């Protein structure tokens, strides 16, 4: 039985999804949940890309105690040095170095010859090996690279000290047959194949990321890279929950085992979905809302008689609890804390105290507080107080001629209160125009989405917005409140605060 490592890049590649920007606190929360999930390696970010990303990688490296943390680096000594500095407090640090090997990348992006690429790989892998015990090399755009040159590049990296070789399908170009053959070719040509950990990193542009990852495992890969919910740029990455459950359900075929705690997938999926603002499609494999629903009468009858008739995955396997009891105003702090831990949240004593106080306020306003409400409670607490701004007062009024007016008061981090007013063709536009004046920003609203967290007249509203600033960078915000307008204001303020406080990244080539 072979052991498959799981490498999660939600915090790096997943964050390249347009509109997805996790702050430091959110990244640490996600990383701690990934640790509970049993992920072997967490790719925390790209340390050289910005001071903000460096601090995130350093904070995660310090917080994680039971799995490896890695950072991305180009074949540049400065990148490697920066990664070493960011990861120095990690219990088990690794580094992930990449350089493109396809002709189109070498000619048009790198402007390097094959000989120059090989020399760079040799030098920088050797340089990194002096600083890290585990060095992973990725030949970017491997599946569109000349096969003979790809093998030469991989051999060069191994000879220079690489301990992990990752094969990226950077643009989602390959298919399972071709990808499996690529690993067979590597096994045949690379004499140290069994001594090195080979990995796959697949994108879902043609809808084959999971199938390609499984084909790699079938043909010798011992590490799979991907993200929770498959988030990522363009069509996304390999969904790790799909690979893990496939290996578990079809252990007879793949003969593989992992460290993954399968019943933590639902918590992981919910957390990342809400923090990223990307809802999980109801028909999503493994963790979608319809994954365990049966509408056909024949199917329903069969499932009631014996679930094995139409269910190969039990809901409990991935942490879907259909019998979770709601909390209420009589629930105590211990029960609340236990439920928070079951849902994947790690709270400090002060955070627990503050959150429990808000829970009691919510329980007074609602008959029952469901798990969805509790997720919203945590996210609402985070979204109401951004890095520098907090919504203190909102007033909306009808002006004349169908025009709406809004008065907004915001508290800055230093305690100063700022207030302004503006008008708009509707209440939402008036509120957002006012916030733009207060923040002194010219930003564009790209997406606005509202949903009820639970059913019933006492449901809270959850608003997600995506904005774009003058640098064409997109930011996501979440707002939660019983009042739709207040939730809308909180969401927009959070996104605006992220835009205002985010340090712009160095203008690098897009990392795949």
From Swiss-Prot:
Protein species of origin: Listeria welshimeri serovar 6b (strain ATCC 35897 / DSM 20650 / CCUG 15529 / CIP 8149 / NCTC 11857 / SLCC 5334 / V8)
Protein name according to UniProt: 2-isopropylmalate synthase
Family annotation (NCBIfam families): leuA_bact, PRK00915.1-3, PRK00915.1-5
Recorded superkingdom: Bacteria
Gene Ontology CC terms, in alphabetical order: cytoplasm
Record note on quaternary structure: Homodimer.
Gene name linked to the record: leuA
Associated pathway: Amino-acid biosynthesis; L-leucine biosynthesis; L-leucine from 3-methyl-2-oxobutanoate: step 1/4
Enzyme class: transferase
Biological role stated in the UniProt entry: Catalyzes the condensation of the acetyl group of acetyl-CoA with 3-methyl-2-oxobutanoate (2-ketoisovalerate) to form 3-carboxy-3-hydroxy-4-methylpentanoate (2-isopropylmalate).
EC number: 2.3.3.13
Single GO MF descriptor: acetyl-CoA C-acetyltransferase activity
Subcellular location: Cytoplasm
Keywords from the named record: Amino-acid biosynthesis, Branched-chain amino acid biosynthesis, Cytoplasm, Leucine biosynthesis, Manganese, Metal-binding, Transferase
Origin organism lineage: Bacteria, Bacillati, Bacillota, Bacilli, Bacillales
Family: Belongs to the alpha-IPM synthase/homocitrate synthase family. LeuA type 1 subfamily.
Cofactor(s) required, per the database record: Mn(2+)
Main location: cytoplasm
